[in-house]
Amino acid sequence: RLLWRTLIGHSWPAEGIRRLLAIPRSIHELIWGLLLLQVIGLQPVIAVIAIAIPYGALVARVVSDLLDSLNERNLQALVAAGTAPPAALLSAMGPPLLPGLISYGGYRLECALRSATLLGVFGLGGLGNELLLTLQSLQFHELWSGLWLLLAVMLSLEAVVGALRRRWGMPGRFSLRAAGVGRRGRELVLAGLLLLPLVFGVGRALAIEPAALLHWQALPPIAPGGWQEALALPWPSLVFNTVLLTLLAAALAVGVAPLLLLLVAPWPWGQRLLQLIWAIGRLWPPPLTALLLLFVLKPGVITAALALGFHNLGILGRLLLEGSEAAGAQRQEALRCSGTGPRLALLYGRFSGLARSYLAYGAYRADVILRETVVVGLVAGTGLGTQLNQSLSAFAFDQLLLLLVAYAALTLLGEDLSDRARQRLLQQ
């Protein structure tokens, strides 16, 4: 909204684009991969496009929300002084936007790593294909070797992103000399230029051919009477169970992260242990966690909610830790020096200032959990995800189309509710 209001004086194009991008956002990358598989065939480019479509829409929404949450006074001052709107936007909003953009970009890159593993079965190869083969052959020792390798890659990625965030997003507290003007900008441009040949080289090594997107295959015809069968599905029950699964998983993920940090506050090693557990939660995709839970639990909404909640708990826990580190320890140390216990000092010294932004991000995370109900549909035994998997297996494209429309409608409704909740939290 801020971008369009500054450039043309109206924000209505932002609302239209936001609603339009809700359609690709509402469909999980796994479903995009299966749909593209029917249209294009088995090609490595399928996995790349299947990840890029929903992730591009998600990044657009998050960047828009970050821009709208920033203070506009510097921008208004530059525009009032006669600066061109594009230059004013870049100068006033670029520096405060950079830390959040780096943090979210690293998180989204980590998500893409997991999605590439999940979509490796579409011809991309790599760990995804190897993990699928080990599961099919019941070679679980090889499965764990692959997962530990993926964990090492993910932790290395976190370390690199953390170093970049500290270098580009935070001031140097002990630096005796101020950084040169435009240093961060020059380093960002240089990093982008260095990444371009790397991206092309990796794409060439994986035999990714964009020309394959031009050769489409015809979808099978819809059987007579298919629409009547699709409309006869138990839609109220499917929607209710999907919403219930989303709410349970979101409550588990949002509520447990700060409670665990408060619980281990007196012990320095406790936070390290939590970081390891949360890293495993981010590493394991929800379907794998759900399969492990089936050894001790029955298929149902609770099992699927635990799988989704554990995965998203790892994500929210990491972001809460990053926010705590960025907030500084001055208030917490002042409370400790006055005799306050470690848990209360952490609660009032750090978490109180992060509560609104954390809950606002939790509202956004609930939208993502709604998308992820697709991948645990078989474990839930009910809901739109289960029915969508059954329709895909039966090639019932009439049912599939209606189910995707239902997911898009739920996503639009969820985004509207989460936007209202987030704006109310951030404005208080």
Which residues fall in each region the model found?
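Membrane-cytosol interface at the C-terminal ends of specific transmembrane alpha-helices
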Residues: 42-108, 115, 159, 299-350, ...
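Hydrophobic alpha-helical transmembrane segments of polytopic membrane proteins
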Residues: 127-164, 384-420
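Generic hydrophobic transmembrane alpha-helix motif, especially the helices
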Residues: 17-55, 275-309
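Short amphipathic alpha-helical coupling elements at transmembrane boundaries
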Residues: 15-25, 65-80, 91, 103, ...
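Hydrophobic positions within alpha-helical transmembrane segments of bacterial inner-membrane proteins
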Residues: 1-2, 30, 100, 104-108, ...
